Amino acid sequence: MSIAMRLKVMSFLQYFIWGSWLVTLGSYMINTLHFTGANVGMVYSSKGIAAIIMPGIMGIIADKWLRAERAYMLCHLVCAGVLFYAASVTNPDMMFWVMLVNAMAFMPTIALSNSVSYSCLAQAGLDPVTAFPPIRVFGTVGFIVAMWAVSLLHLELSSLQLYIASGASLLLSAYALTLPKIPVAEKKATTSLASKLGLDAFVLFKNPRMAIFFLFAMMLGAVLQITNVFGNPFLHDFARNPEFADSFVVKYPSILLSVSQMAEVGFILTIPFFLKRFGIKTVMLMSMVAWTLRFGFFAYGDPSTTGFILLLLSMIVYGCAFDFFNISGSVFVEQEVDSSIRASAQGLFMTMVNGVGAWVGSILSGMAVDYFSVDGVKDWQTIWLVFAGYALFLAVIFFFGFKYNHDPEKIKHRAVTH
């Protein structure tokens, strides 16, 4: 089996695990375990907390002491055990702590999977800019397959979804043992204090361009959290209108939302072209504009024929909004940093997006939703327009604040030699 195909299998399983429970665990906790909304919010907050703490630390470990593929294997082994136990938990406080441990083991694997992929591609003499996006496509496919499998097997309200995730984690942990060895960075004769402490990636903040990049990564991470948290409740709220109570949107909101992940597959494949043709600045600007459209279409969408088309368009542009930021950003970090701190830098990127950004996004977006709610009834149109305005504001500031001169040949050369 070629290295590209082996990495595709890894990517598929990586996101299959997440797709097995991420979308449906909330419904299981509310409907089966009878947790309150606050309980569910507390459990899901574990993702942001873990993402702040763990990816950078695990990246440093993978750079300095433990081979990346071994760190990856150990993390998924922990996830397998924790998810298996989580299936038997019925207390909300215990569920928070159990899922926090799971998140602390799982969140670093996102960055580690990127680092392992880039290193394996480099060892094989392949161009990461061209070879990585098709590999990542299989991650999205894995997420969709898991989500639909749980839905079609009617396990949305069952603890069996956690057993499925546990089994997939155990399988991926074993599979990681078959991956090529990723060498730990050689220690230099003269090292800085930051290097001795394993804080190399944090030195990137001394570079104004990288500092601005990570700042916007955090702010766009907040945008991603908005749609993760409030997309499904928004669609469910159409049930308040008798005209839409029996509509497809109300009955199968998760299936409609899964179109967003499907759109990712197509947009991922366009990343090599857009990155080489236009560069990271234009690609990230396109992402911010896509987020503006995502929220704008939500503002005017509903289950009517015309409104459904707008909702569907919102799902489609999500593919561009998500991929052109997350995947392109990861490739940009890969190209801009020294290979000795690659895993640390990828971990820092994930920390800013899924940690700080997710935490800030949860708090501020929740405040915005409450502000535009009266007696429990949410003014969704105004809420989505506010979020659209935020995304558009980011695009304008990024256009003037991020300095980047695109050189297609330089990008190609650096991608091959890293």
Report each predicted region and the residues it spans.
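A membrane-interface helix-boundary motif in multi-pass transporters
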Residues: 152-168, 367-391
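Juxtamembrane intracellular "pre-TM" segments in multi-pass secondary transporters
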Residues: 1, 180-215, 240-245
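Cytoplasmic helix-loop-helix junction between adjacent transmembrane helices
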Residues: 100-138
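Hydrophobic core of transmembrane alpha-helices in multi-pass small-molecule transporters
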Residues: 12, 82, 92-112, 116, ...
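Cytoplasmic membrane-interface "Motif A"-like loop-to-helix N-cap segments
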Residues: 63-76, 276-288
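Multi-pass alpha-helical transporter architecture, strongest
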Residues: 6, 85-89, 169-181, 355, ...
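Helix-loop boundary and gating motifs at the non-cytosolic
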Residues: 1-48, 209-245, 252, 326
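C-terminal ends and interior cores of transmembrane alpha-helices
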Residues: 77-91, 289-304
